[in-house]
Amino acid sequence: MFYREAGQFYTSYAKDQGIFQLKQDKYGLWGILFIAFVVVPVGLYLMVQGGLMAASTKDYLYNSIFLLLLVNSMAALGLNILTGYCGQISLGTAAFMGVGAFTAFKFSTGLNYRIQKEDEAGELVSELIPLLPAIDNPILLVLIAGAVTAVVGVIFGLPSLRIKGFYLAVATLAAQFFLVWCFSRVEWLYDYVSSSTIQIPPLKLFGLVVTGSETVMRDGQQVTIYPAAETKYLICLSLVVFFAFVAKNLVRGRIGRAWMAIRDMDIAAQLIGIRPLATKLLAFAVSSFFCGMAGAMSLIFYLGALEGAEAFNINESFSVLFMVIIGGLGSITGSFLGAGFITLIPIFLVVSLPWLGGQFGIPVDAAMVEHIQFMIFGALIIVFLIMEPLGLAHLWQIGKEKLRQWPFPY
């Protein structure tokens, strides 16, 4: 069989402790990355050029499915570090994503603040004054958003030093409601706009338009250049792949072992020299860093503009939690599997339920689809918690072990 360790052996402890125990796993990952970075963009481009797909369909796949999947994967990675590896329950993931989004917006506009002064007629007028030069690099904005969110996460992670379990979940839920209230009430966060709407200004990376538009002169005529969906997709994909690799190495090292010791039994971990204070706060910081980047990516690449804080409500926090539970707690792979499952199931239901209802003469509207979606998610959570607590990642691991042993039953 092709999936065997026969002929593969290691001559050093470093290689024996590598991420991939089988070469097939490494080749499989490289194959997935090749498909994501090369096959998908080139394939969709050729399909559009060949008339097999409309350009609007291609843009829909990028803007409504692929980008959302990448943003959810980044958020699930962050929550899995905190809940899956360190055992600290959080219901404030969406709020931390909101912190990242608003941070990216403020730094992209130079941290504007409003002053009032008298004009020539003696009337008071408002003027926005930037504190810093505006940042127009989207990757730098994402990193800054993650860093600021990490600080906020540490502040709201302080209760974990005294409480845990259900009580910690309630504390993070309070953080969720408080931060969402700030997003709607603190005028400075949305540049004092009456509609509470924020919109990322035009950004460029390596000369490519990422957000907004750019007008240039070509052959004596003005041409408006809009951001290509492929550009946003490849930037997001690069960020997710890089930080997934960082997370994988982080949880396999000394820090990750300390997190898992706190998760399994915090008293025993303290007895062997692990400091609960630093370990838990570091988990909150790293988790919030990932969630903040997810929020910034959502605003910059996926949404573009945001009205109030509706995109970061409590439902989004539960959705990310469902991704982690269904995908597998304490698994980097499970974060991607759960994000893919939770992201694609609603799209499948939106397409299939109206068609299925039409076959039986039952009208199915958007509200009914949403209710059925919640019912399915709730049922899946119960099923996975009872029958497969380790999630889809464990099923994937079992499948690989069965493949290695085939055709023998042991």
Where are these regions (language model features)?
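Transmembrane alpha-helices and adjacent helix-loop boundaries
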Residues: M1-Y410
